[in-house]
């Protein structure tokens, strides 16, 4: 049997922009994608700590070093610049492998600098 587990998360990211007119997605600094293992075009859940809103979208790459967390398209109505969010991805593993699996967790500060990655 396969079970769905958290693959990776960016914890307490700060939204830097919200663009209603862009055609969807969440733009994430390439450094943060690399640190977390989140892939461009990978499905992600975004959990807004500030408002409690939750939505699903996909990740796109923002320039390396930009510290951008930019919510685009219709989902831009669910965030405001400065909101704290959690960006989560999931994967499926056989139950036996899942018992020993550890996800990647990247904790961010208010400026989207990495405080801790494990």
UniProtKB/Swiss-Prot annotation:
Modified residues (Pyruvic acid (Ser)): 25
Gene3D superfamilies: 2.40.40.20
Subcellular location field: Cytoplasm
Keywords annotated in UniProt: Autocatalytic cleavage, Cytoplasm, Decarboxylase, Lyase, Pantothenate biosynthesis, Pyruvate, Schiff base, Zymogen
Catalyses which reaction(s): L-aspartate + H(+) = beta-alanine + CO2
GO biological process per UniProt: alanine biosynthetic process; pantothenate biosynthetic process
Source organism, top-level taxon: Bacteria
Active site: 25, 58
Cofactor note: Binds 1 pyruvoyl group covalently per subunit.
PTMs per UniProt: Is synthesized initially as an inactive proenzyme, which is activated by self-cleavage at a specific serine bond to produce a beta-subunit with a hydroxyl group at its C-terminus and an alpha-subunit with a pyruvoyl group at its N-terminus.
NCBIfam families in the record: panD
Entry protein name: Aspartate 1-decarboxylase
Annotated source species: Phenylobacterium zucineum (strain HLK1)
Lineage: Bacteria, Pseudomonadati, Pseudomonadota, Alphaproteobacteria, Caulobacterales
Encoding gene, per UniProt annotation: panD
């Amino acid at each position: 049997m396969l079970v769905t587990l958290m693959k990776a998360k960016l914890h307490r990211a700060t939204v830097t922009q919200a663009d209603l007119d862009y055609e969807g997605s969440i733009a994430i600094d390439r450094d943060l994608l690399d640190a977390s293992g989140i892939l461009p075009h990978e499905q992600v859940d975004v959990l807004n700590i500030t408002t409690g809103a939750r939505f699903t979208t996909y990740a796109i790459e923002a320039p390396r070093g930009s510290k951008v967390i930019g919510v685009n398209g219709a989902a831009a109505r669910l965030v405001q610049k400065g909101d704290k969010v959690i960006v989560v991805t999931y994967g499926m593993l056989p139950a036996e492998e899942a018992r020993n699996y550890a996800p990647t967790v990247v904790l961010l500060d208010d400026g989207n600098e990495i405080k801790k990655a494990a």
